[in-house]
Regions:
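Hydrophobic alpha-helical transmembrane segments of multi-pass membrane transport proteins
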Residues: 4-12, 16, 71-88, 150-161, ...
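C-terminal transmembrane-helix exit sites in multi-pass transporters
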Residues: 86, 103-122, 244-263
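Hydrophobic/aromatic residues within transmembrane alpha-helices
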Residues: 20, 32, 36, 87-88, ...
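Membrane-interface helix termini and inter-helical loops of multi-pass transporters
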Residues: 15-29, 56-59, 89-92, 134-135, ...
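Hydrophobic transmembrane alpha-helices of multi-pass small-molecule transport proteins
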Residues: 44, 122-138, 151, 260-269
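Helix-helix packing/entry segments at the starts of transmembrane helices
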Residues: 35, 97-102, 169-179, 217-251
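Membrane-interface interhelical linkers
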Residues: 1-5, 41-72, 121, 173, ...
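Glycine-/small-residue-enriched transmembrane alpha-helix faces in small-molecule transporters
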Residues: 1-31, 132-164, 214
Length: 269
């Protein structure tokens, strides 16, 4: 399904950003984020052009009721991407994986609270066990796992907002990404036109930045399609694909899975 493809792509994404860093040297997180936004927007616009849906995209920006949900969704998506990129660049992929393991359970809770989806006593017990896992993770990660908590909360709320939207899924996601573009372009123009940004762009860097837009935009499109056609709780279950692959990526990238971290993961599994 579209949702499964989405989480497979997300699961292996850390390796792409790791590759970018290894081939191009340490890239400023903010500059990488700005390039990611711009090229993801280009990717989405191309998809909408092929599908003949560009008029629907422009209509979103004229609908105040839709914008009331799209703007918060865009802000949450921006925050999620920013935290994720920073974590990957700073060797905290396992913390990201822990956050993505917790997300489904936050989604379960939101599904029950907002959309009145039935949550059994088993789900309640599972959520309680996960809370214990989060508390234990403060030891394994050397303090409160802020990356874990931030990613879990932001994307879960984002999923709930997406579930409440009635407009075309791909159009919705494209609108959210497009809203970020002015901020990204202003940042590049004012702060990264020198050698630490655009001035230092080689052909390889440019190709990797374009690729970053594709690996960002495509999963979001698949997610937007899947979340509209699946119960929120089923979406939550599919989310376990990505963090499981994230642990594999963390191992490839040299992160140590200590005993304390393993105990935290076992509680959440």
């Amino acid at each position: 399904s579209a949702m499964a493809v989405c989480f497979l792509l997300w699961g292996f994404q850390p390796l792409y950003w790791f590759l970018c860093t290894n081939l191009c040297g340490q890239i400023d997180t903010f500059f990488l984020m700005a390039c990611r936004i711009v090229w993801a927007a280009v990717c989405c616009l191309c998809i909408l052009k092929v599908q003949g849906k560009l008029p629907r995209l422009w209509a979103v920006f004229r609908d105040k009721q839709v914008l009331k949900r799209e703007i918060p969704a865009s802000v949450l998506l921006f925050g999620d991407w920013m935290v994720y990129l920073w974590a990957v660049q700073n060797g905290r992929v396992l913390e990201c994986s822990l956050g993505y393991y917790i997300q489904p359970l936050v989604v379960f809770a939101l599904g029950a609270l907002i959309f009145k989806e039935k949550m059994s006593w088993r789900h309640s017990v599972i959520i309680a066990i996960v809370v214990v896992g989060i508390v234990l993770s403060t030891s394994g990660f050397g303090g409160v796992p802020y990356v874990t908590i931030a990613l879990a909360l932001m994307f879960a709320v984002y999923a709930a907002i997406k579930k409440s939207l009635t407009i075309d899924s791909i159009v919705s996601t494209s609108a959210e990404i497009l809203m970020m573009v002015p901020v990204a372009l202003l940042f590049i123009l004012f702060f990264r036109m020198g050698d630490d940004g655009m001035g230092g762009m080689t052909v390889l860097k440019q190709l990797l930045m374009i690729g970053g837009g594709v690996v960002t935009g495509l999963p979001m499109v698949f997610y937007a399609i899947g979340v509209r056609h699946l119960p929120l709780m089923t979406t939550g279950i599919c989310q376990y694909i990505s963090p499981s692959l994230g642990i594999v990526c963390g191992a490839i990238m040299g992160e140590a899975l200590t005993r304390e971290k393993l105990v935290s993961f076992l509680f959440i599994w």
